[in-house]
A protein has these predicted regions:
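Structural motif
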Residues: 24-30, 70-72, 117-126
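A structural motif specific to WD40 beta-propellers
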Residues: 36-37, 82-83
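Short loop/turn segments that connect beta-strands within beta-propeller blades
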Residues: 30-33, 76-78, 128-129
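Blade-level signature of beta-propeller repeat domains, shared across WD40, Kelch, NHL, RCC1
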Residues: 96-171
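Loop/turn-rich, solvent-exposed surfaces of beta-rich toroidal or solenoidal domains
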Residues: 46-73, 91-98, 117
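Beta-propeller blade termini
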Residues: 3-10, 48-56, 83, 94-103, ...
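Repeat-based blade/solenoid architectures
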Residues: 1-6, 40-51, 86-97, 145, ...
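Acidic/hydrophobic-patterned starts of short beta strands in beta-sheet-rich repeat architectures
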Residues: 12-21, 57-66, 103-112
C-alpha cells in the first residue's frame, strides 16, 4: 500500500514526475517510471503523502514530507534534504499542507505532530531565512486542487483545468 501520489514537475524539465511514499521510502519517479531519487521513510501506515511547492521561486519544486518522526523538505531535483524538523505522528492518511494561514503573503507548512499517546497538535512552520513565495489561504481537503475551490470557499460553477495553469500544475 502507498499514500496518495503527488504529481508535479519537480525538476523544471517540463515533464511531470511522480512522488509516492511506501513503507520504507519516499520515491520520485520520472515520467518513464525510472527512479529519479528516493529517501528512507519511517511510515508504518503506508498511507502518508508528500506535498510539492516552489518555496524559493526558482522554478524547481521542493518536496515536503512528514513521516512518523520527522518533517523534511527535499530538493525536488536531487533529493537532498534542505530542512529536517522533529515532528512525530502515528501517521494515517495525512500529508503536510501548504497555505498562507496568517495572511502575511508567505506560504507556511501545516501538519499534525504528536508523541503517540500524549499531546496532539497542529503545527505551523515558517521560513526562518529567505521569505517563501506567496500561496493561497485555502486548502479545503485531502484531494485539494487550486481550481476546485474559490478563495471564499465557494465551489466554482465551472472549474478551470489546473493543467492549463503552469504554476498550479501540481496534483
Amino acid at each position: 500500500a502507498a499514500g496518495r501520489a503527488t504529481v508535479a514537475d519537480f525538476d523544471g524539465d517540463g515533464a511531470n514526475e511522480l512522488a509516492i511514499v511506501s513503507h520504507n521510502f519516499l520515491s520520485i519517479f520520472e515520467s518513464d517510471f525510472s527512479v529519479k531519487w528516493r529517501s528512507p521513510s519511517d511510515d508504518g501506515s503506508r498511507r502518508t503523502s508528500a506535498t510539492a511547492f516552489d518555496f524559493e521561486g526558482d522554478g524547481d519544486m521542493e518536496v515536503v514530507y512528514r513521516d512518523e518522526t520527522t518533517l523534511r523538505i527535499f530538493d525536488g531535483i536531487t533529493g537532498a534534504i534542505k530542512t529536517s524538523l522533529s515532528c512525530g505522528s502515528g501517521t494515517r492518511v495525512e500529508m503536510p499542507v501548504i497555505a498562507d494561514v496568517d495572511a502575511d503573503g508567505e506560504a507556511e507548512i501545516i501538519c499534525s505532530c504528536n508523541n503517540l499517546g500524549g499531546a496532539q497538535r497542529t503545527v505551523v512552520f515558517t521560513s526562518d531565512q529567505t521569505p517563501w513565495l506567496p500561496t493561497r489561504k485555502v486548502w479545503n481537503s485531502l484531494h485539494y486542487a487550486p481550481t476546485f475551490i474559490n478563495d471564499d470557499l465557494t465551489i466554482p460553477a465551472q472549474r478551470q483545468d489546473k493543467a492549463d495553469i503552469p504554476r498550479l500544475d501540481v496534483y
